[in-house]
Amino acid sequence: MAKVKVAAVQMSCSRDPIGNLRKAEQLVRDAAAEGAELILLPELFERQYFCQERQYGYYRFAKSVEENEAVRRLTMVSEELSVVLPVSIYERDCTTLYNTVVMLDCGKNLGIYRKTHIPDDHFYQEKFYFTPGNTGFKVFDTSCGKVGIGICWDQWFPETARCLALLGADIILYPTAIGSEPILGGDSAGHWQRTMQGHAAANIVPVAAANRTGLEKVLPCEENAYQESTLNFYGSSFLTDETGKILSGAERDTEEIIFAEYDFALLRETRLEWGMFRDRRPEMYRRIVE
């Protein structure tokens, strides 16, 4: 099997959803022009990260998959460019709201994954906006190979990566929106990368993470009950090999596209040779699900 070229897109997001979508489309086109067949955009790239504050009015941002403008536009782009393109959206399903990825493959909608783990603190108030996903972990059989998806906070849980590996993922993708947390007195960029590098190494499956970049501020107002917050999204998007080694990495504060090539057929053989999954003892792991 020929190698697959994977791209991770790192971009800043403004308050203009139309402008953000246009930028994302151009970056996808740029990646495809460099030969990328599987292109990963950041989490919720249509808008600035609205989860820094609580505003009931922001519920209106959620649209059904069919009504979402990014899905509509990027479906056409995916078909035109013959690429696999996961699209991160704020989804409305009747009266329930989710943080969702729509998997597009050469213009076809292969299905959705809804974020499993929903964070909740001052900077990431996602439980106010999203219901925990009900799809279960998903691996999509695409024209590039079997693609597993986790969304941002999912990437911190080893169970996510292990489930996706057990489902046959050739690569695990993590669209992300993460930045420095002032309460920590620093930032988590190194910890963030090492966590996913470990998932790759433990499962013999490469991972890719696409983060946003830029400073996003929330100013106090009556509508948000006078909340104030600032997140400095630290970029640092990356792609690893199956041992967790970073093959390509982005800077902290630039918009850029990074690339890596993979022979998924060879990696499947490598996983078999390691015997990692042959030697598992699921009957001994009950504590994990207690």
Task: Give a label for each model feature.
Residues 66-84, 152-256:
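CN hydrolase (nitrilase-like) catalytic-core segments centered on the catalytic cysteine
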Residues 6, 103-110, 240-247:
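Short, glycine-anchored, charge-dense loop/turn motifs used at functional sites
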Residues 53-61, 121, 222-228:
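Short glycine/proline- and charge-enriched loop/turn segments
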